[in-house]
């Protein structure tokens, strides 16, 4: 069982959540894949710098993992080899981006992900025939 929390809640909140969660594994949300400009939110850091700060908080708090763009995989791995990484914004080769800004194709994801990385694929599967869409996404990785 997993529960997502915002890593921007800072260290004390993350630790309190971890304590309260019991056997539920916590995943810390870093920067949303739909965000491309943090300055609009009053955050002066670049996306990479903000992701780094939030992953370091998740790691320090001993969360089970993070939810972060697949574009951040190497950055997350440079901080922790043990965190699980759930990556939304995964698309088939020719899928629409919709509101997502920081995406990666499933083919590229499979080349860069390790055994603790998980693709999160939503709209590219549920828009239309889900079975056919899953087949198309998987076939696009060959």
Place the predicted regions along the sequence by residue.
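Glycine-rich phosphate-binding active-site loops on the catalytic face of alpha/beta enzymes
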Residues: 2-13, 90-95, 99-134
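Catalytic-site microenvironment of enzymes
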Residues: 20, 127, 132-142
């Amino acid at each position: 069982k997993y529960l997502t929390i915002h890593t921007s809640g800072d260290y004390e909140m993350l630790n309190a959540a971890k304590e309260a969660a019991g056997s539920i594994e916590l995943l810390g949300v870093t920067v949303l894949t739909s965000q491309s400009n943090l300055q609009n939110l009053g955050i002066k850091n670049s996306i990479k710098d903000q992701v780094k700060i939030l992953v370091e908080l998740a790691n320090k708090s001993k969360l089970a993992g993070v939810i972060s763009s697949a574009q951040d995989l190497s950055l997350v791995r440079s901080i922790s080899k043990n965190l699980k990484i759930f990556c939304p914004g995964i698309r088939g080769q020719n899928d629409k981006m919709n509101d997502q800004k920081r995406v990666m194709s499933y083919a590229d994801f499979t080349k860069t992900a390790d055994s603790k990385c998980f693709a999160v694929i939503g709209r590219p599967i549920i828009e239309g025939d889900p079975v056919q869409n899953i087949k198309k996404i998987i076939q696009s990785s060959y």
